């Protein structure tokens, strides 16, 4: 494909235009009085959302150079979302402010490399101060963090706090759509473990990069599956039932994995493969625990069982299974409580009979996974559009509270970053030239989140920033008052603030040091014309491997 090239200031300015286009769409959502953004969908009704990462992913610009700038901001939002689960809009606002200041200085002749070094020194100093200010989570702080992260929704804050209280900070909490209008909390039998899908082609939700099945069947085995021949009978049976299938095995690879992927993507079979948790004998124990939870059998040579003899009665059943790239959550049906209780009692007896600290630790982990259960927040709303928006807010609140448990909390509303900015004066006094300017770029950008929160609340951003800087207090955008935000319960997770800043500086420093941008040259639109599907139709299972009537061999 032919390429387009852009050089020097022209290249950086085109990147900035693209970054500004996306950032301006995202920044209106920050704070408790942030606005919504309407996203047109290729099918169905539009989405009305308040989530920075979701908005960023939907934006693509016509100009190829500007679109690269937009993709860079998307990367900021995506990285922050992946690592912290929240703070995407804060990261976007910070990155935009730093890029604007940085490019203004490079255009005036500043050294991009020295600017970057100064910016890196500044962010290190801010992170150190942030860690000193951070306080551990206690009392009502969980509810307050969740409320702030969900845009001031008190009900969401209360529900997230209750869910964490019911299953502990380390417990499994999931969010699903409710059949009713009400949003409810339910604690049910379930389990989570650190193993993800064997192939990204199993993903069913591209936005969240997860595979999610309702009322799924589970094939549990401690064997490695490479040949699809072993799976033919059970796959034929499952396809006739119309239920999704998740295969938990030592490993699924080769012909077996390729065939599953192809037929899943053709819509012939809803299927996913996951590597079983743990190793060796502990893997067998983990699979046995999952079998008890789901009412299935572990297909094992130790029990003289083979895959080609599997029946529907041997398969486990789960109300819902959610699989990400590195974790799996199983929500069991309600009729597994007695079996789980008996299994937990059996493991406790085993615990009483061992003196090994390592074995005791692993047995306690198994008990916690089985007995802890899964808290399910069922989200209800009058319309599908409102339901999606509310679900995103609850997921943000959950992620923020988990981050708060990890690294503590600081005063929210953008006030902490603004107050820390004053401490950078000591750093600039020991520097000179463009490194000093790099520190000042970050220092000025630290006021951007508070300024935008104030403007979204209908206040003058510059006036609010000056008053907060001089008073030492914070701005409560919900009430319009200036007060101690820690006492008012306006809290941010330290981890979210830290990662938002670090990711913003990372991208901004790269843009400042950019000299050339290379983009794909847009191809002219193809002439209109007919033609059949180049795939040639589904025709049942893919010929890579067949399955009786479905074409598998």
From Swiss-Prot:
Q: Where is the segment annotated Disordered?
A: 520-543
Any one cellular-component term (Gene Ontology): cytoplasm
Q: What class of enzyme is it?
A: isomerase
Keywords, alphabetical:
ATP-binding, Chaperone, Cytoplasm, Isomerase, Nucleotide-binding
Query: Can you supply a Gene Ontology BP term from the record?
Result: protein refolding
Molecular function (Gene Ontology), one example: ATP-dependent protein folding chaperone
CDD domains under this entry?
GroEL (cd03344)
Which Pfam families does the record match to this protein? Cpn60_TCP1
Q: Where is the composition biased (Gly residues)?
A: 528-543
Function of the molecule = Together with its co-chaperonin GroES, plays an essential role in assisting protein folding. The GroEL-GroES system forms a nano-cage that allows encapsulation of the non-native substrate proteins and provides a physical environment optimized to promote and accelerate protein folding.
The record's family statement is: Belongs to the chaperonin (HSP60) family.
Assembly notes: Forms a cylinder of 14 subunits composed of two heptameric rings stacked back-to-back. Interacts with the co-chaperonin GroES.
The protein's name: Chaperonin GroEL 1
Task: Write down the species.
Answer: Synechococcus sp. (strain CC9311)
- Taxonomic classification, please? Bacteria, Bacillati, Cyanobacteriota, Cyanophyceae, Synechococcales
* Gene name linked to the record: groEL1
